[in-house]
Each structure stands twice: as structure tokens, then as C-alpha cells.
């Protein structure tokens, strides 16, 4: 850790908890001025206060002001997400729309707002927190898998458009991370399958990775910090997988 991001402004969505919180803390440790953007205003304020950042309450599913949030960002980390577990024939259409709005449309709108400033200065870093489910599918997660696959495509298009102008765009694709979102999934999967939560972790979440554990939130931001750094200027348009060997199958 150091001050290699001093003078840079970073926006982290979903920054009040889980991976987003860990990313906000890590980027601040590298000297960035971090905006912690989250639906939970109190939690965002707590994180921002701890790292000397600024909290912004935002509902990414609504008609939020993307320019006000991101048009001066040098670094954009799209991390906000939610999950709903149900078979396709029972999946509520309104929940499908909500998940795509937060996890695909909002990253598009924020990138669209941030890119003119990034292009003007010849520097920008967009890191999209995707998932192994941006590369693979699992039953009962149609909206989440669709949103993450879409985010992979969006990130690559931005990479192609921005690469020659000093702007890079990449995704990070973790397996299951020990976050509130995953804890809720464990409970939902236990209900759907009629098994204990411990069995969900062992028999559903950890069957594919060769490394049999959940990822800790603090592990993901180390890669985020690298991708935001000057030495990562040639890292562009890629999907960086942190899945313990899942996608090696």
C-alpha cells in the first residue's frame, strides 16, 4: 500500500458493505479520494468516515443522477449487486428487471457519465466486479447470471473504445465471497433444496472450486488496486478470475 493513487477520485458503488466496502478501504489506503455510493446511507457514511471519503446515498435501480455521481471520477468500481434465487418459471419479472437495472444498466450509465472526463485527461480505470457467474451459469439464478454476462460484454466494449485514450476496463470474477449477499444466498438455497446451510456451502457452493473455502472480501480489492494503478496500463478488456479453479474445469 502507498500513495500511488494520490490525487485520483474513485467512485465505488455498493461501497457500504462486502466487496465494495473492502474496495473503498483499499483504494483510500492507496491515496484515492473515495466516494462510497450505496443505497444504505448510514452504512455508507460509516465507511466514508472511517476512510476519509464521501458518502452518497443512491438507488441504482431508480432514475439517479449518474453525472453528479461519476462525471469527475478517475476510477469507477461497479460493485453494487443483489440476488434472487428461483427457477425461471417462478422468477418474478419485477425482480429480474430490478437486478438488471442495478447490475447492468447502472454500470453502463455510470461509465457513460465518467468516460468524457477520463478521455479528456487521458486516464481512467473502470473495474467491474463481475462473478464466475459472468462466465458460467448455475440453476435458479437467471437474472444474476444474465446481468453478469452482460457486464462482461459491456466491459469489453468500453475496453475497446477507451484503450487508445488511456482508459482501461476490466472485470474481476470471484467465486463465492463471504458477503451479506452470499449469506442470504446460503439461506435461500437451503430453503429451496431443503437442506442445512452448512450443506449448501459444502455441496453447492464449494463443489466446483479446487480450493474449498469462501473468498474473504479483503482478497478481491488487491486485484482492484492493481488494475487501478499505473503499472496496469496494458491490462485491458480482460476478465480476471478468482474462483479457486472453478473455471479450469
Describe the residue ranges of each PLM region.
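Active-site helix of classical SDR
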Residues: 111, 147, 155
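Residue(s) in the substrate-gating loop at a strand-loop-helix junction
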Residues: 131
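Active-site loop immediately N-terminal to the catalytic Tyr-X3-Lys motif
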Residues: 89, 136-143, 164-165, 212, ...
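Conserved NAD(P)H cofactor-binding loop of Rossmann-fold oxidoreductase domains
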Residues: 80-84, 245
Amino acid at each position: 500500500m502507498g500513495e500511488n493513487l494520490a490525487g485520483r477520485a474513485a467512485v465505488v458503488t455498493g461501497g457500504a458493505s462486502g466487496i465494495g466496502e473492502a474496495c473503498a478501504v483499499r483504494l483510500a489506503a492507496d491515496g484515492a479520494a473515495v466516494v462510497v455510493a450505496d443505497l444504505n446511507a448510514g452504512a455508507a457514511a460509516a465507511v466514508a468516515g472511517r476512510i476519509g471519503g464521501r458518502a452518497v446515498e443512491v438507488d441504482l435501480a431508480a432514475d439517479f443522477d449518474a453525472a453528479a455521481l461519476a462525471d469527475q471520477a478517475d476510477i469507477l468500481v461497479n460493485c453494487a449487486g443483489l440476488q434472487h434465487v428461483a427457477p425461471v418459471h417462478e422468477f418474478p419479472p419485477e425482480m429480474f428487471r430490478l437486478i438488471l437495472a442495478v447490475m447492468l444498466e447502472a454500470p453502463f450509465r455510470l461509465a457513460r457519465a465518467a468516460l468524457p472526463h477520463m478521455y479528456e485527461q487521458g486516464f481512467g480505470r473502470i473495474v467491474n466486479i463481475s462473478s464466475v457467474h459472468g462466465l458460467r451459469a448455475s440453476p435458479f439464478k437467471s437474472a444474476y447470471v444474465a446481468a453478469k454476462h452482460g457486464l462482461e460484454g459491456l466491459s469489453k466494449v468500453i475496453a475497446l473504445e477507451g484503450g487508445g485514450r488511456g482508459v482501461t476496463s476490466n472485470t474481476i470474477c470471484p467465486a463465492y465471497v463471504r458477503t451479506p449477499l452470499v449469506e442470504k444466498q446460503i439461506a435461500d438455497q437451503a430453503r429451496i433444496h431443503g437442506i442445512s446451510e452448512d450443506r449448501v456451502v459444502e455441496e453447492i457452493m464449494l463443489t466446483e472450486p479446487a480450493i474449498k473455502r469462501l473468498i474473504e472480501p479483503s482478497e478481491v480489492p488487491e486485484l482492484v488496486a492493481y488494475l487501478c494503478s499505473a503499472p496496469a496500463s496494458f491490462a485491458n478488456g480482460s476478465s480476471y478470475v478468482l474462483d479457486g479453479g472453478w473455471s479450469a474445469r
